[in-house]
């Protein structure tokens, strides 16, 4: 029997695949790395915004409100995926990432190209 946490990771991976069809469709010139102009710092900004949203929703739920659109669970799945983008960026493997730039998207001479 598969561990529930592994099932969540697989669900997040499937969500990432489906969202990629919209965010990175083949007819577009926009590459995944274009969403992160400051490299890992941009990804961390998005992760921080997701965490703040979770706090906001949970605080509202404590007072009886329900989320209008994205649930805490949805945000959790997004966090898993943004964490995977962070690691992929750190490994210089993100689609459209310029290998002549560092993890902060600054120009550099990388020795490990």
Protein language model features and the residues they cover:
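Intrinsically disordered, low-complexity regulatory regions
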Residues: 1-113
